[in-house]
UniProtKB/Swiss-Prot annotation:
Residues at which Mg(2+) binds: D244, E291, D318
Assigned protein family: Belongs to the enolase family.
Cofactor notes: Binds a second Mg(2+) ion via substrate during catalysis.
Keywords: Cytoplasm, Glycolysis, Lyase, Magnesium, Metal-binding, Secreted
Pfam families: Enolase_C, Enolase_N
Enzyme class (EC, first level): lyase
PROSITE patterns named among the record's database cross-references: ENOLASE
Record pathway: Carbohydrate degradation; glycolysis; pyruvate from D-glyceraldehyde 3-phosphate: step 4/5
HAMAP family: Enolase
UniProt-annotated catalytic positions: E207 (proton donor), K343 (proton acceptor)
Cofactor: Mg(2+)
Name of protein: Enolase
Length: 434
């Protein structure tokens, strides 16, 4: 039977050693689901609230016992006494949103609500004897995503003197996900050798990418291109580049202040100059995607950027849209960006996550399913990417088990789908004219 009989949350640790929420859901038939909630380092100001304790005597104030208690003492009784079925995903998510009663899930915490939402879905999949991607996507979930591999970390994700937060490689020319992963791994290892030969650090950042002291953005790009060529692949054909600028992290008083991360070598650019700079990089290098190229509140700047290069480069809104259909709808109406980054903990339920993906796809925007910098061994985002035919996934570099777990899950899914699965490569960027 699908009726929920037990819900239990506990405090566990994420990939940065910070507390996060784990939730388990059990049905009367023995079906079981477990979910772990991720956490971000650079967060949009409009994201759903990640509830932390603030008690400096525990985990430097980052404990999540309040969120855990909200699951065990408030949400669990509602689910059990209400005799909810794990097959009632939308009703359960709606109930938790109403139980919270705030616009940003600030009362119960998005980390509490999301843990329950995902655990319920996993229990439902277990009940039906289906893989999670098949339960969530039905028979139509079959597209393996292009991996956006963050192999160089900057900004808030490392100590490297580079303002941009992520430098990614996208192996769009591969024939399968399996091959794209191999290409990415070979680029990663060649990059490590190149860095060693230059006497640069090969320690990795939060998301598994290298964080060496490059001379600047273009030095990082040129070095990555060298690693791609060392594998025998062609930049701009087999492999493209991508940036997560995380511009909100260095936007101060109307100025894009690169000096915040790059010191005395960092420029200070107006919105117009920021657009010019990004266009210059796009014209010079094989860049196919740019995330958060402008500040989350600089909608005028976003519009200029979109009008300027939005036909040839994927412009992804992360802090801009925060997986929120209200924000996304406004962006679509105004012609801002052409893609949305999907982070389940930005909005807090699976239902709202799927609503955002559906809205984007109907409008001709792409949806990029994403991890957070503080991750766990949970692989739900891999299943979501396939279930929704998102076509792209962003889940870190080719190191750290918290990142590799997602890639390995996609390898399993590709094997399970066999001939019915597909990897569309460059066709996944249907929002571009090139």
């Amino acid at each position: 039977m699908p009726i929920i009989t037990d819900v239990y949350a506990r405090e566990v640790l994420d990939s940065r050693g910070n507390p996060t929420v784990e939730v388990e859901v059990l049905t009367e038939s023995g079906a079981f689901g477990r979910a772990l909630v991720p956490s971000g380092a650079s967060t949009g100001e409009h994201e759903a609230v990640e509830l932390r304790d603030g008690d400096k005597s525990r985990y430097l104030g980052k404990g999540v016992t309040k969120a855990v208690d909200n699951v065990n003492e408030i949400i669990a009784p509602e689910l059990i006494e209400g005799e909810f079925s794990v097959l009632e995903q939308v009703s359960i998510d709606k109930m938790m949103i109403q139980l919270d009663g705030t616009e940003n899930k600030g009362k119960l915490g998005a980390n509490a609500i999301l843990g329950v939402s995902i655990a319920v879905a996993r229990a439902a999949a277990d009940l039906l004897g289906q893989p999670l991607y098949k339960y969530l996507g039905g028979f139509n979930g079959k597209q393996l995503p292009v991996p956006m591999m963050n192999i160089v970390n900057g900004g808030s994700h490392s100590d490297a003197p580079i303002a941009f937060q992520e430098f990614m490689v996208l192996p769009v020319g591969a024939e399968s996900f399996k091959e794209s992963l191999r290409w990415g791994a070979e680029i990663f290892h060649n990059l490590k050798s190149i860095l060693k030969n230059r006497g640069l650090e090969t320690a990795v950042g939060d998301e598994g990418g290298f964080a060496p002291k490059f001379e600047g953005t273009e030095d990082a790009v040129e070095t990555i291109l060298e690693a791609i060529k060392a594998v025998g692949l062609e930049p701009g054909k087999d492999v493209f580049l991508g940036f997560d600028c995380a511009s909100s992290e260095f936007f101060e008083d109307g100025v894009y202040n690169y000096a915040k991360f790059e010191g005395e070598n960092g420029a200070k650019r107006s919105a117009e100059e920021q657009v010019d700079y990004l266009e210059e990089l796009v014209n010079k290098y094989p860049i196919i995607t740019i995330e958060d190229g402008m500040d989350e509140n600089d909608w005028d700047g976003w519009k200029v950027l979109t009008d300027r290069i939005g036909d040839k480069v994927q412009l992804v809104g992360d802090d801009l849209f925060v997986t929120n259909t209200v924000k996304l709808s406004e962006g679509i109406e105004k012609g801002i960006g052409n893609s949305i980054l999907i982070k389940v903990n930005q909005i807090g339920t699976l239902t709202e996550t799927f609503d955002a993906i559906e809205m984007a796809q109907k409008a001709g925007y792409t949806a990029v399913v994403s991890h957070r910098s503080g991750e766990t061994e949970d692989t739900t985002i891999s299943d979501i990417a396939v279930a929704t035919n998102a076509g792209q996934i962003k889940t870190g570099s080719l190191s750290r088990t918290d990142r590799i777990a997602k890639y390995n899950q996609l390898l399993r899914i590709e094997d399970e789908l066999y001939e019915t699965g597909k990897f569309d490569g460059l066709k996944s960027f249907y929002n571009l004219s090139k």
